[in-house]
């Protein structure tokens, strides 16, 4: 024992100076890492800032950007939520930043600009429509501090107007539903305002279906509270689908992803609760032709029903998590192109046949189908619990789903 102790003592004495130097170096390394974290990372790791963390679509964007090698910062306006959003506990979220007030505040742009100044020209990824429009209205100011692909405010406004999209599609020879100026000649018809989002309507309230004249009169009276001349269109039968596109600064096509609706809630017509990825070259070509005609830049989803184009969402869309489920590189391509990097469009660069569901919403949808007597659809929905990918889940990042469920079920 004495020999061992003696040898250990000699060993420690011999390497004492080396140990001291190592400890000093370690202390310096810790300080350097802290400085790097404060300044947005080292030279090899660039920063991406994702806004509006309260939206579940932000989770997919954060994970994709982190995987692409970015240090991801998430922002959220404090008064718009009751507690920190689920994305804040994601392993892919390197930093979470509160912004005082709500995103509708007059000084929101200045607050967001102030946050951006703390980083070295980060990639800016806007999730919420209000933030997107805020940046679009002051593109030059934001472009001096961040990299992004966002169309001018005027372009976003035109694309948000369903009638403008309808007329442009007609000019391009792209199929659209028939419209009625007065009382419809036949039913059913769909009644919707020119831009439901502008009036603060939830997705499920942005249109209504009239099966006869009596229903039409009631719906028109309700819709005219928001829009004095709502759009009246023939109701198209067929599967609903979305073609999501990424366009560069010169409106060049950089990425595409198709998905079809499997279920929705309310089941009479509402947001998608389950969808499946697929590929359709014709639909992509038509969607791209439409967006290109507006000289669009950025991310958008063109909504189809059957062969007809219904509308355009010129922003991050509700089923955006499909980009992760189908392993689409569209988010990474957004960041790369925003920084001036070269991105070449590759057709079908994602997995097809991937089903994705939003657990809570889709469970309610499946039960609603059963209650309505549509047993096969209801049972199929319950069966997808075991086969479809959960939109917000990811291996090794389970805290996010648990936080989301807790907020959804218990936070009012």
Task: Map each language-model feature to its residues.
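Serine residues within intrinsically disordered or low-complexity segments
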Residues: 22, 28-31
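Active-site nucleotide/adenylate-binding loops and adjacent lid/helix of ATP-dependent enzymes
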Residues: 156-230, 237, 249-252, 281
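ATP-binding N-terminal substructure of ATP-dependent carboxylate-amine bond-forming enzymes
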Residues: 2-19, 24, 40-149, 405, ...
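A short beta-strand motif that forms the metal-chelation/ATP-contact edge
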Residues: 190-192, 245, 306-316
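Peripheral (often C-terminal) accessory segments that flank ATP-dependent C-N-forming ligase machineries
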Residues: 336-412
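Short, acidic/small-residue loops that bind anionic groups at enzyme active sites
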Residues: 145-159
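A short glycine-rich, hydrophobically flanked beta-strand micro-motif that places a catalytic Asp/Glu
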Residues: 297-306
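ATP-dependent carboxylate/phosphate-activation module, predominantly the ATP-grasp catalytic core
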Residues: 205, 211-214, 234-240, 244-295, ...
């Amino acid at each position: 024992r004495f020999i061992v102790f003696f040898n250990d003592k000699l060993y420690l004495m011999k390497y004492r100076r080396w140990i001291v130097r190592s400890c000093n170096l370690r202390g310096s390394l810790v300080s350097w890492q802290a400085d790097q974290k404060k300044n947005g990372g080292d030279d090899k790791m660039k920063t991406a800032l994702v806004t509006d963390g309260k939206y579940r679509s932000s989770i997919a964007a954060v994970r994709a950007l982190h995987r692409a090698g970015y240090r991801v910062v998430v922002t959220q306006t404090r008064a718009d939520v009751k507690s920190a959003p689920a994305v804040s506990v994601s392993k892919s979220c390197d930093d979470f930043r509160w912004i005082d007030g709500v995103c509708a505040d007059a000084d929101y742009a200045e607050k967001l600009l102030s946050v951006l100044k703390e980083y070295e020209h980060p990639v800016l990824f806007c999730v919420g429509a209000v933030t997107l429009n805020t940046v679009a209205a002051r593109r030059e100011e934001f472009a001096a501090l961040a990299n992004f692909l966002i169309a001018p405010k005027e372009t976003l406004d035109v694309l948000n107007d369903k009638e403008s999209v309808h007329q442009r599609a007609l000019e391009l020879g792209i199929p659209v539903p028939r419209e009625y100026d007065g009382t419809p000649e036949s039913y059913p018809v769909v009644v919707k305002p020119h831009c439901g989002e502008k009036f603060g309507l939830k997705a499920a309230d942005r249109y209504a279906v009239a099966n006869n004249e009596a229903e039409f009169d009631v719906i028109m009276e309700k819709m005219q509270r928001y829009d004095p001349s709502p759009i009246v269109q023939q109701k198209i039968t067929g599967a609903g689908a979305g073609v999501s596109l990424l366009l560069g600064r010169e409106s060049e096509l950089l990425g595409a992803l198709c998905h079809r609706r499997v279920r929705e809630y309310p089941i009479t017509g509402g947001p998608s609760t389950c969808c499946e990825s697929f590929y359709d070259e014709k639909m992509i070509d038509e969607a791209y032709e439409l967006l290109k005609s507006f000289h669009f830049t950025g991310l958008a989803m063109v909504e189809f029903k059957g062969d007809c184009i219904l509308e355009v969402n010129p922003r991050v869309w509700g089923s955006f998590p499909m980009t992760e489920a189908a392993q689409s590189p569209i988010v990474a391509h957004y960041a790369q192109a925003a920084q001036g990097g070269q991105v070449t469009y590759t057709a079908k660069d994602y997995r097809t046949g991937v089903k994705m569901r939003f657990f809570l919403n889709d469970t309610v949808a499946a039960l609603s189908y059963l209650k309505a007597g549509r047993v096969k659809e209801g049972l199929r929905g319950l069966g997808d619990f075991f086969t479809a990918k959960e939109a917000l889940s990811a291996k090794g990042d389970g805290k996010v789903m648990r936080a989301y469920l807790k907020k959804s079920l218990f936070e009012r």
